[in-house]
C-alpha cells in the first residue's frame, strides 16, 4: 500500500462529504469545519462534451456545475482553497469523454487537491449517452485508457461507482481489469426497489478489494447506519442528509474515534 493511502487510513474521522451536482463547491464545504475526513467537490465537467451535457441537464431544472472550460483552472484552484477551510482532505469528482482535452484541468486539480475521483456513477441520460457516468463501468477498455493516464498525475485515484447497474461479477471483473490504476472505491450501495443499502454486495466488494480504500454510501443518516456500513468500509459518505441539517450524529461519531 502506497504512502498516500497509508495517510488516508490514518484519518481520525470516518465520514466523507459525497459530491452533489451543483451543490458541493468550496463555499458549501467551508461551512462544515472539522466535521468530515474528506470533502468532495463537484462533479465537474472537464471537456466540451460533458460541459454541453451539463448545460442540457440544467435546462431540465437540475442543478449542475457548468463552469466555462476556459475559466475552469482558476475556478477550481479557488474552490479547493475554500474547501480546505473545512480542515478535511479535498477530493474532486470529475467526468469527461476526451481525456486529452481534460488533461490540463486534471493537472491543475492534481496540483492542488488530495484525491481525484472519477465519476463512474452519474445516471443522467445526457451523461450516460456519452458512454460515461455509470456506463463507464461497462467499458473496461475505456476505463483503463482513462486511468492509465490519470495514474501519471501521482495522486490517489478513486472511482465513484453505483451498485446494481451491472451484475456484481461483471463489476468485480471490470474493476480487477484496472486494479493497478486506482486506489479507492466510493461505492453507492444502490439497491433498486429497496429503501436501504445493498450491504451484501458491499461486503463482497470490500473483501475482493481489501487493498483499496472503501467509502460506503447510500441512506446513511445516523450513527447506527454508519456503524453498520463501516463493518465493510473504511469510511461512509453522506449527501442529502446534510442538506436537511442532520449533522449532530456525525459530531457524536467523531467523538467516538472508532
Curated annotation (Swiss-Prot):
CDD domains in the record: arch_FMN
One Pfam entry name: Dus
InterPro entries, alphabetized: Aldolase_TIM, DUS-like_FMN-bd, MJ0144_FMN, tRNA_dU_NifR3-rel
PANTHER family reported in the protein's UniProt record: DUS-LIKE FMN-BINDING DOMAIN-CONTAINING PROTEIN (PTHR11082:SF36), TRNA-DIHYDROURIDINE SYNTHASE (PTHR11082)
Name of this chain's protein: Uncharacterized protein MJ0144
Phylogenetic lineage: Archaea, Methanobacteriati, Methanobacteriota, Methanomada group, Methanococci
Amino acid at each position: 500500500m502506497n504512502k498516500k493511502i497509508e495517510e488516508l487510513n490514518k484519518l481520525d474521522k470516518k465520514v466523507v462529504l459525497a459530491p452533489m451536482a451543483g451543490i458541493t463547491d468550496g463555499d458549501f464545504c467551508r461551512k462544515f469545519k472539522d466535521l468530515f475526513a474528506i470533502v468532495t467537490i463537484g462533479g465537474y465537467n472537464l471537456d466540451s462534451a460533458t460541459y454541453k451535457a451539463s448545460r442540457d441537464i440544467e435546462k431540465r431544472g437540475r442543478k449542475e456545475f457548468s463552469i466555462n472550460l476556459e475559466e475552469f483552472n482558476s475556478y477550481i484552484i479557488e474552490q479547493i482553497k475554500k474547501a480546505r477551510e473545512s480542515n478535511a482532505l479535498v477530493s474532486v469528482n470529475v467526468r469527461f469523454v476526451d481525456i486529452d482535452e481534460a488533461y490540463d484541468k486534471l493537472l491543475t486539480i492534481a496540483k492542488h487537491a488530495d484525491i481525484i475521483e472519477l465519476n463512474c456513477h452519474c445516471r443522467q441520460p445526457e451523461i450516460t449517452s456519452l458512454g460515461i457516468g455509470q456506463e463507464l463501468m461497462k467499458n473496461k477498455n475505456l476505463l483503463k485508457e482513462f486511468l492509465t493516464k490519470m495514474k501519471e498525475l501521482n495522486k490517489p485515484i478513486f472511482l465513484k461507482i453505483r451498485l446494481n447497474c451491472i451484475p456484481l461479477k461483471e463489476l468485480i471483473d471490470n474493476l480487477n481489469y484496472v486494479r493497478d490504476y486506482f486506489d479507492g472505491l466510493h461505492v453507492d450501495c444502490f439497491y433498486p426497489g429497496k429503501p436501504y443499502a445493498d450491504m451484501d454486495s458491499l461486503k463482497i466488494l470490500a473483501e475482493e478489494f481489501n487493498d483499496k480504500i472503501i467509502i460506503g454510501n447510500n441512506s446513511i443518516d445516523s450513527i447506527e447506519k454508519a456503524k453498520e456500513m463501516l463493518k465493510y468500509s473504511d469510511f461512509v459518505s453522506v449527501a442529502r442528509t446534510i442538506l436537511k441539517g442532520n449533522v449532530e450524529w456525525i459530531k457524536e461519531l467523531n467523538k467516538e474515534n472508532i
